Amino acid sequence: MSLPSLDSVPVLRRGFRFQFEPAQDCHVLLYPEGMVKLNDSAGEILKLVDGRRDVAAIVAALRERFPEVPGIDEDILTFLEVAHAQFWIELQ
């Protein structure tokens, strides 16, 4: 695995849907074979994965929203790396 480049644009893979699930009280990724429960951090990142923003814009938006979180850049990049490896997202 390798960290995504800052100019790549993440997009949810076909067949995946991101939404808040009241019964689970969290954001989830739904796909034909099941569901992935996401923690709060993953939910905040995936809210910004819209197929238009590049990784740099996502990092900048979250850094601005959560300035008190140390190492947020690396956390975001690592999550996107894992999401890509799990085939939840594609990087364009």
Swiss-Prot record:
The keyword Isomerase does not apply. One of its GO terms (biological process) is pyrroloquinoline quinone biosynthetic process. The keyword Electron transport does not apply. It holds the Pfam family PqqD. It comes from the Bacteria. InterPro entries: PQQD (IPR008792), PqqD_bac (IPR022479), PqqD_sf (IPR041881). Keywords: PQQ biosynthesis. Gene3D superfamilies: Coenzyme PQQ synthesis protein D (PqqD). One of its GO terms (molecular function) is quinone binding. Pathway: Cofactor biosynthesis; pyrroloquinoline quinone biosynthesis. Functions as a PqqA binding protein and presents PqqA to PqqE, in the pyrroloquinoline quinone (PQQ) biosynthetic pathway. HAMAP family: PQQ_syn_PqqD (MF_00655). Monomer. Interacts with PqqE. Belongs to the PqqD family. This is PqqA binding protein.
